[in-house]
């Protein structure tokens, strides 16, 4: 029988980090909430040390904040931050298209087609979180095909903010048919090597998602004010 490898401190920290990220995505941790080290440690079945280390990493990403002598809190929803994230997304994603299209081949196009098909299949499903993940997968696959690792890493951080911090509160509001059509058109333009058309479609697509996200947040904020 083989011996079981003992987990290192880094292994436990990574496990805690991924576990907390999963709680964010599943809405088990909500915006503005005080985070209890002990509660998270119990739910993750580990000590508080790796949990605290994981929270420090999440603080760097902007998902939580630390208040001296009070502990960690999740950040509240910020309209200005959402606008900034989508603006930055547009800058990064559109800037990657020239390299993506110039380096396109049959193998890369097949990868993009698979990501597109996965998304189209997911949006027909009742599981909205799967739809969200497949949407991100399509955009990240497209970005990775450019070969620009630094910009791709920045884009991944932006998706983390959108999909973990804001989750279903604002990201399920764009009509599915609109997203489908825009993704299909974007794929077709990339397959045809039409850079200018692909830039136009991608810019328009991100602007549409941004518009619906802003409208959703403003509606939520107005409803909250009305209850006061």
Where on the chain are the PLM-derived regions?
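Short linear motifs at protein or domain termini
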Residues: 1-102, 214-228
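Mobile beta-alpha loop/short-helix "lid" or hinge segments that flank ligand
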Residues: 60-65, 158-160, 175-177
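Alpha-helix N-cap/N′ positions at the starts of helices
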Residues: 69, 92, 114, 178-181
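Conserved amphipathic alpha-helical segments that form helical-bundle/coiled-coil interaction surfaces
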Residues: 85, 97, 102-168, 181-188, ...
